[in-house]
Design a protein with these regions (language model features):
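N-terminal beta1-alpha1-beta2 module of alpha/beta enzyme domains
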Residues: 1-87
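Flexible, glycine-rich active-site loops centered on histidine and acidic residues
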Residues: 2-20, 99-150
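Acidic (Asp/Glu)-rich catalytic clusters
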Residues: 37-38, 82-90, 116-129
Length: 150
């Protein structure tokens, strides 16, 4: 049986009100990723969200039950994926999910993914990049990018 791991890398206050620095946030992620790699997890799924902290905190039914905060890091998935591959030996990396609208559109995303796959092919590895896309779940995530859902 194969087990995967889901990472919601978020810079939001914990239950004690502590907000980690970006350096601490990434250090925690890399430590957890290293442990998952050593323990034999199959895929490290990385969540991504944009501009959702305040809105998510007001949501009476949050995406992640009992968690009123950011669902995933606002970052370039491909860059984080390559760094994750560089730091590990066995685990695959996947996006959960990349918002097409909030990340430059479908053509820009296709180019990023193609480049990332090409970079990965030059590593001594048979590992895979798993990619999931979405059109964006919430209007507040798309509107700042000039996209007004119908």
């Amino acid at each position: 049986m194969e087990f995967d791991i889901f990472f919601s890398i978020s810079q939001t206050p914990d239950h004690n009100g502590f907000t980690p620095s970006e350096s601490e946030m990434f250090s925690n992620y890399y430590a957890q990723l290293d442990a998952a790699d050593r323990l034999g997890f199959g895929v490290a799924w990385i969540a991504q969200a944009h501009l959702s902290t305040k809105t998510q905190q007001m949501n009476s039914k949050p995406v992640v039950p009992h968690w009123k905060g950011e669902v995933g890091l606002c970052t370039d998935f491909c860059q984080l994926a390559m760094e994750s591959f560089r730091r590990t030996k066995n685990i695959d990396v996947g996006s959960a999910v990349v918002s097409i609208l909030a990340s430059g559109g479908p053509i820009a995303q296709a180019e990023r993914i193609a480049n990332t796959v090409q970079f990965l092919s030059h590593m001594d590895s048979n590992r895979k990049l798993h990619v999931g896309f979405s059109a964006g779940r919430f209007e507040f995530m798309a509107r700042p990018y000039g996209i007004i859902p119908r």
